[in-house]
């Protein structure tokens, strides 16, 4: 299992253990799960059945726990193995047609009050902040994914209906999160690529352990990046200094060969001799070796005079 999948699974395992205290929040979390995982089956006028499928055992247990708490409907649990990916199991919770199924579908916005299928009908409970958090948690458990912070910052939630995607975007926005949307095959994906926004989302849905882990990795990563930037800057400065020193040595040797050093002032002759004696030293260090010592700017001024004199010989 990759780092990204294991982190996403860790987040979902943590969220799957949470049980909202308020009945309205339990209803909205179940609504989010039904919305994300549910497949509506219509077998005649007003006869609905519902199947929820997931490859996460903790999520399937969360579905069952919320069903028991929210609705008295009968359900069947099936565990199947994918044909193409034999290692993966699929957990299916099938709710056959019965009294209460329509209420679940209406709760998730799949049908309107008249029982007609709809792309999205917003439950009135979503006017409450705590219920929106619960709905987002259920939706993420069903169709969300988050990358591990070690490599990249990416969190996404997948949905199918444009109206539902817009509603999710508004819920996230009201929670302080600006998600972007992209079409992917037959789905719409809301995604976040900023670390601060992902951390905010994890806190919003209640994944506090995952949030701390994400923050810890991010801080370590930023510290490493800062150290790397400092090292790169120092290496660049050292390279620049070495190149400049090499040019200075070459210029002074030309002056020496032409006998021009004998005609310069003693301070310039002193600095030229120090540069030849200490080719790796910085101008600041050369200035400190002068007698009397001079500042870095003073040493640089003298060196510019020597370089200009060498250029005049060409």
Swiss-Prot record:
Keywords: Cell cycle, Cell division, DNA-binding. GO terms for molecular function: DNA binding; endonuclease activity. The keyword Disulfide bond does not apply. Belongs to the WhiA family. Involved in cell division and chromosome segregation. This is Probable cell division protein WhiA. Residues 282-314 bind DNA. It comes from the Bacteria. GO terms for biological process: cell division; regulation of sporulation. The keyword Hydrolase does not apply. HAMAP family: HTH_type_WhiA.
